[in-house]
UniProtKB/Swiss-Prot annotation:
Keywords: Amino-acid biosynthesis, Histidine biosynthesis, Hydrolase, Methionine biosynthesis, Multifunctional enzyme, NADP, One-carbon metabolism, Oxidoreductase, Purine biosynthesis
PANTHER family named among the record's database cross-references: C-1-TETRAHYDROFOLATE SYNTHASE, CYTOPLASMIC, C-1-TETRAHYDROFOLATE SYNTHASE, CYTOPLASMIC-RELATED
Entry-linked PROSITE patterns: THF_DHG_CYH_2
Organism lineage: Bacteria, Pseudomonadati, Pseudomonadota, Gammaproteobacteria, Alteromonadales
Protein name: Bifunctional protein FolD
Catalytic function, reaction form: (6R)-5,10-methylene-5,6,7,8-tetrahydrofolate + NADP(+) = (6R)-5,10-methenyltetrahydrofolate + NADPH; (6R)-5,10-methenyltetrahydrofolate + H2O = (6R)-10-formyltetrahydrofolate + H(+)
The keyword NADP is assigned to this record: yes
Known function: Catalyzes the oxidation of 5,10-methylenetetrahydrofolate to 5,10-methenyltetrahydrofolate and then the hydrolysis of 5,10-methenyltetrahydrofolate to 10-formyltetrahydrofolate.
CDD domains attached to this UniProt entry: NAD_bind_m-THF_DH_Cyclohyd
Recorded GO MF terms: methenyltetrahydrofolate cyclohydrolase activity; methylenetetrahydrofolate dehydrogenase (NADP+) activity
Length: 284
């Protein structure tokens, strides 16, 4: 058996097209286009690539896009003042501060400064709390995108045993909340988990987000499972691989996301969806 590929690029394109259509309708009704402000501090090469893709996606769907590229030595106070300005900017519906930030900047303090209704990354404690209480507002982008990918398979995943490997604030923890909301029986594995293999082998639905190349051997994957690989790792050879040993896993899984072209495009698509939602729900 060879797994069905969950094509994140194609699904993300559909999402962007739907958003672009809605933006066109708004403009035709003399309503303003949604606005997204992207803040980049420093010259981290990976961050520059990610920010570039987000800005490009904004332009494609017709958003107002404002960019703020700040030097690495930017003070925390300067960054907080910029966020305050954007919180009060009526053309801006979403504020994104690209992570990681340079050393010396308090990430928690900075992210919490963003007003929750403009927190289109979904990282603010208010938005995470809403998700935990089964009243989601603006949802974290990567987990939200993964739910869209799962829905695309047509598989009824309510009641499935879902295993999330990785417990970061950005992916693992909110992913577990999304899966609970969807009706899965959910296990979260992390660096202190004993006998990881046993947990993984039981997973009907496996989500891996640890940032380590081929960390999960493919033969651990349960026959017929759905595998969502969030990782994207560059080997010394230059090849990009995920956190799961793909070549073996695809022979056992029923559905699997490729790397690249799986989860990554959906993260940006979800950001675009969140910005439109923030505009229409909170700022129109």
């Amino acid at each position: 058996m060879t797994a069905n590929i969950i094509d994140g690029k194609a699904i993300a394109k559909q999402v962007r097209s739907a958003v672009a259509q809605r933006v066109s309708e708004r403009v035709a009704q003399n309503l303003r286009a949604p606005g997204l402000a992207v803040v980049l501090v420093g010259l981290d090469p990976a961050s520059q690539v990610y920010v570039g893709s987000k800005r490009k996606a904004c332009e494609e769907v017709g958003f107002i896009s404002k960019s703020f590229d700040l030097p690495a030595n930017t003070t925390e106070q300067t960054l907080l003042e910029l966020i305050d300005e954007l919180n009060n900017d009526q053309e801006i519906d979403g504020i994104l501060v690209q992570l990681p930030l340079p050393e010396g900047l308090d990430v928690e303090k900075i992210l919490e400064r963003i007003t929750p209704h403009k927190d289109v990354d979904g990282f603010h404690p208010y938005n995470i709390g809403r998700l935990a209480q089964r009243m989601p507002a603006l949802r974290p982008c990567t987990p939200k995108g993964i739910i869209t990918l799962l829905d695309s398979t047509g598989v009824r995943y309510k009641g499935l045993h879902a295993v999330v490997v990785g417990a970061s604030n950005i992916v693992g923890r909110p992913m577990a909340l999304e899966l609970l909301l969807a009706g899965c029986t959910t296990t979260v594995c992390h660096k202190f988990t004993q006998d990881l293999e046993t947990h993984v082998r039981r997973a009907d639905l496996l989500v891996v987000a640890v940032g380590k190349p081929e960390f999960i051997p493919g033969d651990w994957v349960k026959e017929g499972a759905i595998v969502i690989d969030v990782g994207i790792n560059r080997l010394d050879s230059g090849k990009l691989v995920g956190d799961v040993e793909y070549s073996v896993a695809e022979q056992k899984a029923d559905f699997i996301t490729p790397v690249p072209g799986g989860v990554g495009p959906m993260t940006v698509a979800s950001l675009i969806e969140n910005t439109l939602e923030a505009c229409e729900k909170y700022h129109s």
